[in-house]
Amino acid sequence: MLSYSTGRRKCAVAQLRFFSGNGKIVVNGCSLDYYFQHNSAFTKIIRSPLKLLNLELLYDFIIVVKGGGLSGQAGAIRLAIARVLAGLSPSNRSSLKSKRYLTRDSRIKERKKYGLKKARKAPQFSKR
């Protein structure tokens, strides 16, 4: 194992182990395509830091991801991969930072307030 990293997005937390290998990505014991239901949008999000640095076929990743939905999990995995690749060399870090792959997206679900139907949706107002 070369390195370890963690990424978070919405309610999802991804823990990543990083090995030298041939580009295999395993998520929760399944292949990347199978876990994300062959959805190319999610796999594109996850592979984008690797594609940017042309490192797609050099490293293997074993990822355990919990919480959230598929979109949040894909974002968490992308952040974890970007953090691990940024630690390899300073030039990687600058190119990943320019594309904002190292920025933690802090937007989370707003809590529901009492007296309201949802976080901001109020019941219909009647004057009379």
UniProtKB/Swiss-Prot annotation:
Region (Disordered): 106-128
Pfam families according to UniProt: Ribosomal_S9
MF GO annotations: RNA binding; structural constituent of ribosome
Organism: Cyanidium caldarium (Red alga)
GO biological process: translation
Protein name, entry field: Small ribosomal subunit protein uS9c
Gene behind this protein: rps9
Principal subcellular localisation of the protein: plastid
Keyword entries, A-Z: Chloroplast, Plastid, Ribonucleoprotein, Ribosomal protein
